[in-house]
């Protein structure tokens, strides 16, 4: 369960080289940190020790995290919190033409996409996950064969991509699969 009792994504892990050192730095930057959890206007990020590829014992996954979506209502505060305070690299800030502003922050191999729909003082919230697949048609077929409801593949908003939406109610997190066109 998410904060406030809502179902869905409760927190996302951020791999860092030094959890205590990073936590102390984020406190100095004015963020709310309790132990290894950083809270940004209702969104919880858990600091975890980064591991090298050699330390990971599981086989490679056909899916890798492409981006985490955060919905926000104040673009200036979001830029300050996710960029200057948390230290993510703001790569793109634009009006999407779809009724919201998109702010894209680089975070390791993934992106934190902050979607700003309107100004206000509502708390931020996780809006979903997008997973990258080198072979989206095969991944979609695998999921459908496993009984997961997945939309047809369609053109993505980012040029050169295709996407499919996972519509599994048990997942409770809006989920998108992204692949090359």
Regions found by a protein language model. Name each.
Residues 1-10, 157, 164:
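Conserved donor-binding loop and adjoining core beta-sheet/short helix segment
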Residues 5-16, 46-79, 85, 126-131:
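N-terminal beta-strand motif that seeds the catalytic metal site of vicinal oxygen chelate
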Residues 20-64, 94, 98-116, 144-181:
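Vicinal oxygen chelate
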Residues 26, 78-83, 143:
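Conserved active-site tyrosine of GNAT-family acetyltransferases
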Residues 103-132, 139-140:
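Acidic/His-leaning functional-site neighborhoods
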